[in-house]
Amino acid sequence: MLRYHMQGFSGYGVQYSPFFDNRLAVAAGSNFGLVGNGKLFILEIDRSGRIVEVNSFLTQDCLFDLAWNESHENQVLVAQGDGTLRLFDTTFKEFPIAIFKEHEREVFSCNWNLVNRQNFLSSSWDGSIKIWSPLRKQSLMTLTPRPLEITKMVDPLNAIILKKKSFTGISKNRNCVYQAQFSPHDQNLVLSCSGNSYASLFDIRLPSGKNQNNFLVHSGLEALTCDFNKYRPYVVATGGVDNAIRIWDIRMLNKNESATIKRTVPGQLHNSSCINEIPNAHGLAIRKVTWSPHHSNILMSASYDMTCRIWRDLSNDGAKETYKTNSTDATKGSIFNFTQHSEFVFGADWSLWGKPGYVASTAWDGNLFVWNGLG
């Protein structure tokens, strides 16, 4: 295990370089990201196994996420709390080479298109997703998940929990798009998750009125994270405030979102596209889920309970569907539990390089850890 401490800053996002096996970027904020500066750290693992800072950029607001430019080895994009995205060249000092500003609230996520490598997207508290080109300051397209009421398709008995005071923040954040991602298989597909507990799947080739499917993913509680499986184009995972990880088959989504939820037992809801579930995967909300780049049935999660976990998706054995669920397994499919962080874990990423299983994680404790989750 390797460690790097970002003195005075809390980690929000981390990503390995797609070009260099020893380089990482970390997005961070001072004062837990609540107020004050942000900082982009460019780190390298040297030959002696130490993590060293090779460059950094101080920003005027917290950084919530980042993405390496898939077509330029020295460029990193960051999502900033003032509603802007900033593109930095790691060979320069101090200033970004481009600023993109259209969002009206904090930008919570950014993601580079892995297929065409020419576009990137952003998602924001303002309820929108924007698609950009690094060659122009204006966005190419704005996507807005349909405004869906939290209880629209939830049975009133099951929605009682929403009336508890501890969940009053959900109504305030219902339009916040916490994360959005391009599909690694199709440059035209975008997946997002929002505070209204819905995930949205967009096909940007279609007209705006017909380009999305919305499906309830976390029982009326905020959906905080989502990811496409790297090998199974039709499989996605989500995580949220209900402490659960759910795995979905997007081929089973109905075109009309009102039909995606079907009653099977009075007072209960069933979504036909949910193919697996890890209930109570963590003790607190799940902030990040990400599929392995080396295995089709392994994923990682990071949580407010200060841990990262590696899971095996028991519904697939790596070659075919097994029709099993993690919820019926004694270990829930858990492979490894990383417990070295002492604060909320926000960011985690798999290494593309070397022996499969190496990951990096960062948290509010200001630490970046590099560790092996597969032994």
From Swiss-Prot:
Transport as a keyword?
Answer: yes
GO (cellular component) term, any one: peroxisomal matrix
Q: What InterPro entries has UniProt attached to this entry?
A: G-protein_beta_WD-40_rep, PEX7, WD40/YVTN_repeat-like_dom_sf, WD40_repeat_CS, WD40_repeat_dom_sf, WD40_rpt
Pfam families assigned = WD40
Effect of changing W364A: reported as: Decreased formation of a ternary complex composed of PEX21 and PEX7 along with PTS2-containing cargo proteins
Where found, per UniProt?
A: Cytoplasm, Cytosol; Peroxisome matrix
Q: Which GO terms describe its molecular function?
A: peroxisome matrix targeting signal-2 binding
Broad class of the protein's primary localization: cytoplasm
Q: What does this protein do?
A: Receptor required for the peroxisomal import of proteins containing a C-terminal PTS2-type peroxisomal targeting signal, such as 3-oxoacyl-CoA thiolase. Specifically binds to cargo proteins containing a PTS2 peroxisomal targeting signal in the cytosol. Cargo protein-binding triggers interaction with PEX21 and formation of a ternary complex composed of PEX21 and PEX7 along with PTS2-containing cargo proteins, which is tranlocated into peroxisomes by passing through the PEX13-PEX14 docking complex.
Per the record, the similarity remark reads:
Belongs to the WD repeat peroxin-7 family.
Subunit details for this protein? Interacts with PEX21.
Protein name per Swiss-Prot or TrEMBL: Peroxisomal targeting signal 2 receptor
Q: Which gene encodes it?
A: PEX7
